[in-house]
UniProtKB/Swiss-Prot annotation:
Domain named Arf-GAP: residues: 27-153
Notes concerning its domains: Contains FG repeats and 4 N-P-F repeats.
SUPFAM superfamilies linked: ArfGap/RecO-like zinc finger
Polar residues compositional bias, start-end: 157-166, 188-210, 283-298, 454-481
Gene Ontology MF: a single term: zinc ion binding
Stated name of the protein: Arf-GAP domain and FG repeat-containing protein 2
CDD domains found in the cross-reference section: ArfGap_AGFG2 (cd17903)
Presence of keyword Repeat: yes
């Protein structure tokens, strides 16, 4: 400008020429500021206060680049900061030199040199109040301030990025600078660490190759199992029975005696379970012989016999409730089991003719009637050669007049029961005195108006030789029939 002023011939030529040179110089400095905020330093692209991208202002007080919002907050501090717009103001040479010596990176080292992110938090840029409080802590109170003489600013070269210089404040550095000179040791460690991995993979693959596959072992085991049963893959293994050997359904097991004997449903003269009489000569309870002429007590289960001629009220009741016992064998049954009473083949106890005759244990009676309990008084019976009249004993059929005796059907269950223990005899067998036992009806007229002839079976499941009681007629000696 001085040179232009000297050359100007006129009085106003130097002023116009100096103004133009001033505008040209300011344009050069403004372009330099834009370069600083654009591409010369990467840290200047973001706001120093809120880290927002797109800086528009320059803080001449501290030498940083900020956004529009933070520029207004900086003006409100005490003392207020001097802020200029990058595109709408002019800059002088000292200002540009100061901005070149500072910038956001150097300002961070100075004003945030003692800042610890673990104890302090950067406020959110969307909350202006918190940002203002943060700026007051930073600039007014200088809470994290570090003197500039301890921080060296970056050196700039035209058209190139600046290289920061080591300072007292730690900053983010590459891994190579942290490790130092023996940096290749990291690669060596990586190679050594990768080597055991590869070796382990090799060992694992080798172990897998040496081990047989699991399905082959299973297949071998199954082949061995098939070989044990003869090599037939379709043969079923012979398994031992889980339970004891029991006969098949319907089979018969050998009789063991007692309650578990089920031979009553099969053929043969074996003893039945319920209500069967023992064979002749095998009475359950044999009474001991007593002297002749004495009255013999009946064993358990037998009822003493009462004479028919003695006028005994109990005998009358017994004769009223049940018919007379036939001379022949009367089949008696309880619970559907076949059992036949021998024809007056009771066990004779004693040796005299005056002793009473008792029945062996095992005979059963009708469950609807009770046996007549008479005292064993010996008496003379004109209808019996031994002088005794048989009475209804335990196990003998003595149905009352209200319960007619039913004749069993001719094919219901007769085939499934065994043969009678004693051969049946013809009903109305003549005794030694020439009269049958059925003549008792004539001896006691009026006491048994609905009596039936002797010899009719009371077992509904046995086939008897007599016909139906409704078809048969009583003897003609009864005046009521």
């Amino acid at each position: 400008m001085v040179m232009a002023a000297k050359k100007g011939p006129g009085p106003g030529g130097g002023v116009s020429g100096g103004k133009a040179e001033a505008e040209a110089a300011s344009e050069v400095w403004c372009r330099r500021v834009r370069e600083l905020g654009g591409c010369s330093q990467a840290g200047n692209r973001h706001c120093f206060e809120c880290a927002q991208r797109g800086v528009t202002y320059v803080d001449i007080t501290v030498g940083s680049f900020v956004c529009t919002t933070c520029s207004g907050l900086l003006r409100g501090l005490n003392p207020p900061h001097r802020v200029k717009s990058i595109s709408m103001t002019t800059f002088t040479e000292p200002e540009v030199v100061f901005l070149q010596s500072r910038g956001n990176e150097v300002c961070r080292k100075i004003w945030l040199g003692l800042f610890d992110a673990r104890t302090s938090l950067v406020p959110d840029s969307r909350d202006p109040q918190k940002v203002k409080e943060f700026l007051q802590e930073k600039y007014e109170k200088k809470r994290w301030y570090v003197p500039p003489d301890q921080v060296k600013g970056p050196t700039y070269t035209k058209g190139s990025a600046s290289t920061p210089v080591q300072g007292s404040i730690p900053e983010g550095k590459p891994l190579r600078t942290l490790l130092g000179d023996p940096a290749p040791s990291l690669s060596v460690a990586a190679s050594t660490s990768s080597q055991p991995v590869s070796q382990s993979h090799a060992r694992t693959s080798q172990a897998r190759s040496t081990q047989p596959p699991p399905h082959s072992s299973v297949k071998k085991a199954s082949t061995d199992l098939l070989a044990d049963i003869g090599g037939d893959p379709f043969a079923a293994p012979q398994m031992a029975p889980a339970f004891a050997a029991f006969p098949a359904f319907g089979g018969q097991t050998p009789s063991q005696g007692g309650f578990a004997n089920f031979d009553a449903f099969s053929s043969g003269p074996s003893s039945s379970v319920f209500g069967s009489l023992p064979p002749a000569g095998q009475a359950s309870f044999q009474a001991q012989p007593t002297p002749a002429g004495s009255s013999q007590g009946t064993p358990f289960g037998a009822t003493p016999l009462a004479p028919a001629s003695q006028p005994n009220s109990l005998a009358d009741v017994g004769s009223f409730l049940g018919p007379g016992v036939p001379a022949a064998g009367v089949p008696s049954s309880l619970f559907g089991m076949a059992g036949q009473v021998p024809p007056l083949q009771s066990v004779t106890m004693g040796g005299g003719g005056g002793s009473s005759t008792g029945l062996a244990f095992g005979a059963f009676t009708n469950p609807f009637t009770a046996p007549a309990a008479q005292s064993p008084l010996p008496s003379t019976n004109p209808f019996q050669p031994n002088g005794l009249a048989p009475g209804p004993g335990f196990g003998m059929s003595s149905a009352g007049p209200g319960f007619p005796q039913a004749v069993p059907p001719t094919g219901a269950f007769a085939s499934s029961f065994p043969a009678p223990l004693f051969p049946p005899q013809t009903p109305l067998v003549q005794q030694q005195n020439g009269s049958s036992f059925g003549d008792l009806g004539s001896a006691k007229l009026g006491q048994r108006p609905l009596s039936q002839p002797a010899g009719i079976s009371t077992n509904p499941f046995m086939t008897g030789p007599s016909s139906s009681p409704f078809a048969s007629k009583p003897p003609t000696t009864n005046p009521f029939l």
